[in-house]
């Protein structure tokens, strides 16, 4: 049994930035620091930050007056920002800059009076944050959420000639392209973003897992069950005809999965740290893996700046 590692895998620039914001805020201002929603969707990361002094809450009414609060990488509705400002809370915004780009697109279309179709998963924090950029006070348009291609057939927008679309950043690239094509067929005048809203890391990890699936008879994806991008990786492998499982850590591996398998692929979602991948590798070696190699993949060098107040000051 041989293990192949996908490349790239694991943390993206937005996740790195969000986690570092929480760590630096605790170091700079002291605990506790409040974080609205899980800063990234990974249990290991959240538990580690809790031990450092982060307190995770779902809404701002759980945050005391005069406290510091961090918005998660998924972004927040405008109403949440306004509430934080009204209460005088100190805020650090860990929203991924690529999600912020989508927020700006929605706000721009809103001001222009357009209808907007958001392609995404209902209930996901990123979708809730993006939907929350819309305000009837800004313009006469309407925002619609479409989750799959079947919903396009029943979609009835108010302004078919004044329509734009945008997407959640962590979707399946193939599924999203299919939905966009169906929308364009139904609404030929629909506008789109200049560049795809699906982020570089999502695209790269999906390309990498497909490369992995072509060479393996089992693909393990390290990621938490509430991680959208991690779920998409496992789905893609299965869609390509390969058995695949999403696991939080090495303890979730069922030895029965690897019986008779010759090549096991291993990757990780954008919110899963390398330490969990290392743990899975160690467990696979215990179960008989004889070697490990890493596939070639798209190099990633993107880095997002931290808020000025949290940047390290160089002395000397």
UniProtKB/Swiss-Prot annotation:
Signal peptide: none
Record Gene3D superfamilies: 3.40.50.11270, 4-hydroxy-3-methylbut-2-enyl diphosphate reductase, catalytic domain (3.40.1010.20)
Binding positions for [4Fe-4S] cluster per the UniProt entry: 12, 96, 199
Cofactor(s) needed by this chain: [4Fe-4S] cluster
Residues annotated to bind isopentenyl diphosphate: 41, 74, 124, 227-229, 271
Annotated Pfam families: LYTB (PF02401)
UniProt KW Oxidoreductase keyword: yes
Catalytic class of the enzyme: oxidoreductase
GO biological process, one term: dimethylallyl diphosphate biosynthetic process
InterPro entries: LytB/IspH
HAMAP family in alphabetical order: IspH (MF_00191)
Official protein name in the record: 4-hydroxy-3-methylbut-2-enyl diphosphate reductase
Entry keyword set: 4Fe-4S, Iron, Iron-sulfur, Isoprene biosynthesis, Metal-binding, Oxidoreductase
Listed pathway(s): Isoprenoid biosynthesis; dimethylallyl diphosphate biosynthesis; dimethylallyl diphosphate from (2E)-4-hydroxy-3-methylbutenyl diphosphate: step 1/1; Isoprenoid biosynthesis; isopentenyl diphosphate biosynthesis via DXP pathway; isopentenyl diphosphate from 1-deoxy-D-xylulose 5-phosphate: step 6/6
Organism: Xanthomonas oryzae pv. oryzae (strain KACC10331 / KXO85)
Function: Catalyzes the conversion of 1-hydroxy-2-methyl-2-(E)-butenyl 4-diphosphate (HMBPP) into a mixture of isopentenyl diphosphate (IPP) and dimethylallyl diphosphate (DMAPP). Acts in the terminal step of the DOXP/MEP pathway for isoprenoid precursor biosynthesis.
EC number(s) given by UniProt: 1.17.7.4
Active-site residues, record numbering mapped to chain: 126
Annotated family: Belongs to the IspH family.
Co-factor remark: Binds 1 [4Fe-4S] cluster per subunit.
Annotated positions binding dimethylallyl diphosphate: 41, 74, 124, 227-229, 271
GO terms, molecular function: 4 iron, 4 sulfur cluster binding; 4-hydroxy-3-methylbut-2-enyl diphosphate reductase activity; metal ion binding
Top-level taxon of the source organism: Bacteria
Reaction(s) this enzyme catalyzes, per UniProt: isopentenyl diphosphate + 2 oxidized [2Fe-2S]-[ferredoxin] + H2O = (2E)-4-hydroxy-3-methylbut-2-enyl diphosphate + 2 reduced [2Fe-2S]-[ferredoxin] + 2 H(+); dimethylallyl diphosphate + 2 oxidized [2Fe-2S]-[ferredoxin] + H2O = (2E)-4-hydroxy-3-methylbut-2-enyl diphosphate + 2 reduced [2Fe-2S]-[ferredoxin] + 2 H(+)
Residues annotated to bind (2E)-4-hydroxy-3-methylbut-2-enyl diphosphate: 41, 74, 124, 169, 227-229, 271
């Amino acid at each position: 049994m041989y293990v192949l590692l996908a490349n790239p895998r694991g943390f993206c620039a937005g996740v790195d930035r969000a986690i570092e914001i929480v760590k630096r805020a605790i170091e700079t201002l002291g605990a506790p620091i409040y974080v609205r929603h899980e800063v990234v969707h990974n249990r290991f990361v959240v538990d580690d930050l809790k031990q450092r002094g982060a307190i995770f809450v779902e809404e701002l009414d759980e945050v005391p007056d005069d406290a510091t609060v961090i918005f998660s990488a998924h972004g927040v509705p405008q109403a949440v920002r306004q509430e934080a400002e009204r209460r005088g809370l100190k805020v650090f915004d860990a929203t991924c800059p690529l999600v912020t780009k989508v927020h700006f697109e929605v706000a721009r279309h809103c001001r222009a009076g357009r209808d907007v179709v958001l392609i995404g998963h209902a209930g996901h924090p990123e979708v809730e944050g993006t939907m929350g950029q819309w305000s009837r006070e800004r313009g006469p348009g309407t925002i619609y959420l479409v989750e799959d291609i079947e919903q396009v057939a029943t979609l009835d927008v108010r302004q078919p000639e004044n329509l734009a679309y945008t997407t959640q950043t962590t979707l399946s690239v193939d599924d999203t392209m299919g939905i966009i094509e169906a929308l364009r067929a139904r609404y030929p005048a629909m506008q789109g973003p200049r560049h795809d809203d699906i982020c570089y890391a999502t695209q790269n990890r999906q390309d990498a897992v497909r490369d992995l699936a072509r060479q393996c008879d089992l693909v393990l994806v390290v990621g938490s069950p509430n991680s959208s991008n991690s779920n998409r990786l496992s789905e893609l492998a299965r869609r390509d005809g390969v058995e695949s499982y999403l696991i939080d850590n090495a303890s979730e591996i069922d030895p029965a999965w690897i019986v008779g398998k010759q090549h096991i692929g291993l990757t990780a979602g954008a919110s899963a740290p390398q330490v969990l991948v290392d743990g899975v590798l160690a467990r696979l070696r215990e179960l008989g893996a004889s070697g490990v190699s890493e596939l070639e993949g798209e190099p990633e060098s993107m880095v997002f700046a931290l808020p000025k107040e949290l940047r390290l000051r160089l002395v000397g």
